[in-house]
Amino acid sequence: MTKYIFVTGGVVSSIGKGIVAASLGRLLKNRGLKVTIQKFDPYINVDPGTMSPYQHGEVFVTDDGTETDLDLGHYERFIDINLNKYSNVTTGKIYSEVLQKERRGDYLGATVQVIPHITNAIKEKIMRAGTTTDSDIVITEIGGTVGDIESLPFIEALRQMKSDLGSDNVFYIHTTLIPYLRAAGEMKTKPTQHSVKELRSYGIQPNMLVVRTEQPITREMRNKIASFCDVEPEAVIESLDVKTIYSIPLNVQKQNMDQIVLDHFDVQAPKADMSEWIDLEHHVQNLSRTIKIALVGKYVALQDAYISVTEALKHAGYTDDADIDLKKISAEDVTPENVEELLGDADGILVPGGFGDRGIEGKITAIKYARENDVPFLGICLGMQMASVEFARNVLGLKDANSAEIDPKTPDNIIDLMADQEDVEDMGGTQRLGAYPCKLKPGTVAAKAYHNEEVVMERHRHRYEFNNKYREAMAAKGMVFSGTSPDNRLVEVIELPKKRFFVASQYHPEFLSRPNRPEGLFKAFIDAANQTGKVKA
């Protein structure tokens, strides 16, 4: 029978529940168990696809085209699995589906209520995550903190799961903060005690506590927490601040986190072989070089807005024994007058995805600088589109060239709306989303980046595409269309082969990068940038 692990949080948000859940998932997977993981977000949006990155951070896209919370990126990178639409569920999605059933008459005239209809829908999503993947273990993280009014239906559903499945088949983990008061030189357990008290008031007794802390907790403190919160002392897991998040699975393994869970489930499994992870973590802590990458984007003020890009750069750097010094530059600040000052010390320039016209000219200026000065360049999604526009303006001489998204009246719409998007009215969930095949042209930089594979599957999130009526003119000036859809209609990758590295993709390669298996384009980009990387002092 499938076993279910529920991860909740208390005291403060952004406490690291997702990393804890992903770390446990990796340990259980390495013990030979099939694991899947999901995130419930209490907000009323159906998905994060229409939310500002400043509000929510990055939108992560799964193979099946679901726009999800950025925590799913952590899940995939840590556990090395591909997730699906059941891996991210919001209050908005639950209510939308319940209301659709009510309109169809599925409830046979019953009064539709939070209990049982909403809670049953939540439980169905939990069960589906396991049945659709045939998993041994389902890990479910609840966003926000216990006590938030928005999360109450989810907490109630988790409580009911124990009655539905039996206590031997569910395991509750509660993550909390132990604040350190520098003035007093003390760590305080009271917030954790109150958070657990709140959780217990909703009918859930946690089996394990994960306490986030700046300082190591003492045995006395561990026993105190265990006594007041009614858990075993060994089930109080310390989560210290670390230099790299890839230390966390090893840290919690040392505290027998995975074994405690399996003992509760009465599941026998060999000890997790984490030798590859140990090597990775040691390598990450001892990198000998530094590569400076300039990321020119729209949402640089928020760290999480480009989290998958940041992690993909790091993964590629690890294989080159290089730490990535990421210099985030607001595209709005880049002008022809200051571009040398802003980008002159960069070993590579990356322009990521985005939407809208704000900062567009700054991105084009940065791309022009990379092309004219032969600085390794990687463009992603909008970055690829603007690389095409820059080439049209400054190489083909089409001075008013633009994207129809930015300037609908441009005489040279190098980037145009996709035909199947013309009658689309809703914004949410209507883009070209998910994994699609990209056919690579043999002998190109892109093909070599993927070890000369003929076709690669990559994830997309866009409405606009390269306008094929400009393909011939650009090719005549040296641009190579090295990746296309299998029918050759949609341009997926462009490159300038005479440059050290100048490649841009319509798809989002960052979503498939793994810490021990960097994505091809990122690896090739960092390899090129590494030629000017600096040895660490």
From Swiss-Prot:
GO terms for cellular component: cytosol. Mg(2+) binds at D71, E141. Allosterically activated by GTP, when glutamine is the substrate; GTP has no effect on the reaction when ammonia is the substrate. The allosteric effector GTP functions by stabilizing the protein conformation that binds the tetrahedral intermediate(s) formed during glutamine hydrolysis. Inhibited by the product CTP, via allosteric rather than competitive inhibition. Residues 292-535 form the Glutamine amidotransferase type-1 domain. Keywords: ATP-binding, Glutamine amidotransferase, Ligase, Magnesium, Metal-binding, Nucleotide-binding, Pyrimidine biosynthesis. CDD domains: CTPS_N (cd03113), GATase1_CTP_Synthase (cd01746). The keyword Metal-binding applies. Its EC number is 6.3.4.2. InterPro entries: Class_I_gatase-like, CTP_synthase, CTP_synthase_N, GATASE, GATase1_CTP_Synthase, P-loop_NTPase. One of its GO terms (molecular function) is ATP binding. It comes from the Bacteria. CTP binds at S13, D148, I149, E150, K188, T189, K190, P191, T192, Q193, K224. Pathway: Pyrimidine metabolism; CTP biosynthesis via de novo pathway; CTP from UDP: step 2/2. Residues 1-267 are annotated as: Amidoligase domain. The active site is at C381 (nucleophile), H508, E510. UTP binds at S13, K188, T189, K190, P191, T192, Q193, K224. Gene3D superfamilies: 3.40.50.880, P-loop containing nucleotide triphosphate hydrolases. It is an enzyme of class 6 (ligase). It holds the Pfam family GATase. L-glutamine binds at Y54, G354, L382, G383, M384, Q385, E405, R463. GO terms for biological process: 'de novo' CTP biosynthetic process; pyrimidine nucleobase biosynthetic process. Homotetramer. CTPSs have evolved a hybrid strategy for distinguishing between UTP and CTP. The overlapping regions of the product feedback inhibitory and substrate sites recognize a common feature in both compounds, the triphosphate moiety. To differentiate isosteric substrate and product pyrimidine rings, an additional pocket far from the expected kinase/ligase catalytic site, specifically recognizes the cytosine and ribose portions of the product inhibitor. Catalyzes the ATP-dependent amination of UTP to CTP with either L-glutamine or ammonia as the source of nitrogen. Regulates intracellular CTP levels through interactions with the four ribonucleotide triphosphates. This is CTP synthase. It comes from Lactiplantibacillus plantarum (strain ATCC BAA-793 / NCIMB 8826 / WCFS1). The lineage of its organism: Bacteria, Bacillati, Bacillota, Bacilli, Lactobacillales.
